[in-house]
A protein has these predicted regions:
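N-terminal nicking endonuclease/strand-transfer module with a His-rich metal-binding environment
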Residues: 1-210
């Protein structure tokens, strides 16, 4: 049994008004885990509106993640504090609609496998929760899952890596290409008199392309 044909919806959680997956990773974790959580970034304590529909919640980590990240409060506060920009993207959220005829045991088993294979095995830290609520429009059962994913990679020591890195553009011989000043025809130097080379910025992971 897989979630291959089950409806999913992905959004970005971030500080920008254009992010539709929430504006605080801690708030989102509080919501899906149905627990009170304090945000060290904004000083707010987030309270879940209700918790009766919570079936299961769990944090899943890659091998290089600190064991303390098993605590969702520690994980998502670390995510928040690693981002300095006022418009930073913080996390990716998924809502997965599950078949209402599934048992809780099957739902947990399938979602753990789905999260492990698609996200954790690629290096992401993930929290998922399963809710069993009532559809307010038709009164029917609404079994579904929420997933919250990190956007930054972790290095071998368990520290957050930059989302992007600078790489030098090389010529056909594999050598760096000088950055030439059009006015002087000479290679540019910075304020420390260091030579400048053509470069570009690339993402440190390809998670945003999936």
């Amino acid at each position: 049994m897989t979630v291959k044909n089950i409806s999913t919806r992905a959004q970005i959680c971030g500080r920008s008004a254009n992010c539709h997956g929430g504006h605080s990773a801690v708030e989102q974790a509080s919501y899906i885990g149905r627990v009170k959580m304090y945000s060290e970034y904004d000083g707010h304590t987030y309270y879940p509106k209700y918790s009766e529909d919570l079936v299961h919640s769990e944090v899943m980590l890659p091998p290089n993640a600190p064991s303390e990240f098993k605590d969702p409060t520690r994980l998502w506060n670390s995510v928040e504090l690693s981002e300095k920009q006022s418009n930073a993207q913080l996390a990716r959220t998924f809502r997965v609609e599950l078949p209402n005829e599934w048992s809780y045991e099957l739902a947990v088993e399938v979602m753990k496998d789905f999260v492990q294979r698609n996200f954790v095995d690629k290096g992401m830290c993930a929290e998922f929760a399963i809710h069993d609520s009532e559809n307010k429009k038709n009164g029917q059962r609404n079994l579904h899952s929420h997933i919250l994913l990190t956007l930054r990679s972790l290095d071998d020591e368990g520290h957050w890596m930059p989302k992007q890195k600078k790489v030098y553009i090389l010529d056909e011989n594999g050598d760096r290409i000088p950055l030439i000043d059009k006015k002087t025809g000479m290679q540019k130097v910075d304020k420390q008199n260091r030579k400048q080379w053509k470069c570009s910025t690339v993402c440190t992971n390809d998670w945003g392309n999936k």
